[in-house]
From Swiss-Prot:
It comes from Nitrosococcus oceani (strain ATCC 19707 / BCRC 17464 / JCM 30415 / NCIMB 11848 / C-107). This is Arginine--tRNA ligase. The keyword Oxidoreductase does not apply. Its main location: cytoplasm. Pfam families: Arg_tRNA_synt_N (PF03485), DALR_1 (PF05746), tRNA-synt_1d (PF00750). One of its GO terms (molecular function) is arginine-tRNA ligase activity. Its EC number is 6.1.1.19.
Length: 585
């Protein structure tokens, strides 16, 4: 619909240009939007206000000139000029009825467009450290990122999905040490577990598999391991204790044996993450290893570029980045006193490699706890001369899980958390994914487990899926009633769809393509979730007020065409959110 109105306005502007009233006009300036108030028509354009200065006309006068030159169209019932020069369009009912035919003809393709055609997007999301299973907090980032990828693809962008595997650095060493200590316990040793180690049952499971598969690992006593270490918390510094313990175990095991423990821990957890995401309906084009940055020399190259440009300085044996020169609150260490790069150095190299691959846009989806990290990343890239317009860092608030009225506390380090796998087993993938995207990513959300499991109209995903299943049920009744749906005849008699509930449903269907485009461009999958709830509500109201399988063939076929189109749009929308559309419930 918007495209038809856009073309009408373009024709009018071309006429004004030919008459010399407009010297030129840019097609990108033509904007047509749905009105929020139906008393102002169905669509409105502010084009006369945009071009008034260029045309040397008052906006209202230019609006008069544009309206006078609009070609006639059977879908346009009335055109008004309102306020300072808005051009309001009221559409005739056939304009909305025509949407039914479009849906039935285009099927799965309905709602897709070419807005992003020829443009590429690099989308990195989830990227949880492989130090434990994915928990429900990661689930929201997964649902949001995957839905955004699907939406961007639907509007024409070529999307590259990537998971950045943080498989280097201190956290991975803490995991490896935690596994090794549990391994020693299985071998009969008794020793204190570090207060800041990883304590979940999954660590014990990795240790068990390590013991079952590796008989040649060296064995060291608790006395040998603990000798010479500083005190742990509460009497000592837990971080200094951990660092000393890591180095001690590396020395005792040697490079090869330590690497076996490290790889066993990494590969076990990473395999679980891959499996959980696949079951959640999330796939990636690439899993990018942080260690690969070191192997390819990317970190060293990035650091040398910063040094050469004068953006690094030495202090206390470490190399620091002048982040404050680029808007950050303080300078940041990139190379530690021991010569090892920091996580920040790896992230600089990773982002630089992404930017240099030529994508039109780089989107990072991070947990909200990383908000303080944004200024330093942007500062480093600005120092390297990168175009920050390419980079879009989006934050996702973690979901707060409730069981009844009780808030569930979670901590990966202590092992007290609900995994994404457990959540899906309890409420199902569909409920989890829909609930996760029902709020804007930047908004806090409370995840009600009991509501997500309920089969009632209060459960949003059930309500939407039930609308789809209900429509499927109507079509199954055709055979029982000895009716046959004549789709072609239904489309020929769409003019019979003039009841109030039908007009409401037609109007809602006509919005779908615009909602998909807006949800993609604004990075707002929740707009589509809201739309599907509204569409389901309109259908359920229609279902309760009217009989579809009436004896009049033309009316029956037209109504069946309408609900068939509704079914298709619900399925299309749910698919973009990664949710199934069941045919029976």
């Amino acid at each position: 619909m918007k495209e038809h109105l856009w073309n009408l306005i373009a024709d009018a502007l071309s006429s004004l240009q030919q008459e010399g009233i407009l010297s030129s006009w840019n097609k990108d300036k033509i904007q047509v939007q749905r009105t929020r108030d139906k008393s102002h028509g169905d669509f409105a354009s502010n084009i006369s206000m945009v071009l008034a200065k260029e045309a040397r006309q008052k906006p209202q006068k230019l609006a008069d000139l544009i309206v006078a030159r609009l070609p006639e169209h059977p879908w346009v019932k009335k055109v008004d000029i309102a306020g300072p020069g808005f051009i309001n369009f009221t559409l005739a009912l056939p304009a909305f009825q025509a949407v039914v035919s479009q849906v039935l003809e285009q099927k799965e393709s309905f709602g897709r467009c070419r807005t992003g055609h020829g443009k590429t997007v690099h989308l990195e999301f989830v990227s949880a450290n492989p130090t434990g299973p994915l928990h429900v907090g990661h689930g929201r980032g997964a649902a949001y990122g995957d839905a955004l990828a699907r939406l961007l693809t639907a509007v024409g962008y070529q999307v590259h999905r990537e998971y950045y595997v943080n498989d280097a650095g201190r956290q991975m060493d803490i995991l490896a040490v935690s596994v090794w200590l549990r391994y020693l316990e299985l071998c009969g040793e008794t020793l204190p577990f570090p207060s800041n180690g990883y304590q979940g049952e999954y660590v014990r499971n990795i240790a068990r598999s390590l013991k079952a598969g590796e008989e040649d690992l060296p064995h060291h006593s608790a006395t040998e391991i603990l000798a010479g270490l500083p005190a742990d918390a509460p009497t000592g510094d837990r971080e200094k204790y951990l660092d000393a313990l890591i180095q001690k175990i590396k020395n005792l095991l040697g490079k090869n044996s330590y690497q076996k423990v490290f790889e066993q821990a990494l590969n076990t957890i990473l395999a679980g993450i891959r499996e959980d995401l696949a079951k959640f309906g999330v796939t990636y084009d690439a899993w990018f290893s942080e260690r690969h940055l070191t192997e390819m020399g990317a970190i060293e190259i990035a650091i040398e570029r910063l040094k050469a440009a004068g953006h690094l300085y030495q202090k206390a044996g470490a190399w620091w980045f002048y982040a404050t020169n680029f808007g950050d609150e303080k300078d940041r260490v990139v190379i530690r006193e021991n010569g090892q790069p920091t996580y920040f150095a790896s992230d600089i190299a990773y982002h630089l490699s992404k930017l240099e691959q030529g994508y039109h846009k780089i989107i990072d989806i991070w947990g909200a706890d990383h908000h303080g990290y944004i200024p330093r990343i942007k500062a480093s890239l600005q120092a390297l001369g990168a175009d920050l317009q390419q980079l879009d860092i989006q934050l996702v608030q973690f979901a707060i899980l409730y069981r009844g009225k009780e808030k569930i506390q979670m901590s990966t380090r202590s092992g007290e958390f609900v995994t994404l796998r457990e959540l899906c087993q309890e409420v199902g993938k569909d409920a989890a994914r829909f609930f996760y995207v029902m709020r804007g990513a930047e908004q806090h959300m409370d995840f009600d487990l009991e509501l997500a499991k309920s089969q009632s109209n209060e459960n949003p995903v059930y309500y939407v899926q039930y609308a789809h299943a209900r429509i499927c049920s109507v079509f199954r009744q055709l055979k029982t009633r000895e009716f046959v749906w004549n789709s072609e005849q239904g489309r020929e008699h769409l003019g019979k769809l003039n009841e109030a509930h039908e007009v409401t449903l037609l109007d809602r269907l006509s919005c779908y393509s615009e909602v998909v485009e807006s949800a993609a461009i604004q990075s707002a999958p929740h707009l589509l979730a809201y739309y599907l709830l509204d569409l389901a509500r309109d259908f359920h109201t229609y279902y309760n007020a009217h009989t579809f399988l009436v004896d009049i063939p033309e009316l029956r076929d037209a109504r069946l065409a309408l609900i068939a189109a509704t079914r298709q749009v619900i399925k299309n929308g749910l698919t973009l959110l990664g949710v199934s559309a069941p045919e029976s419930m």
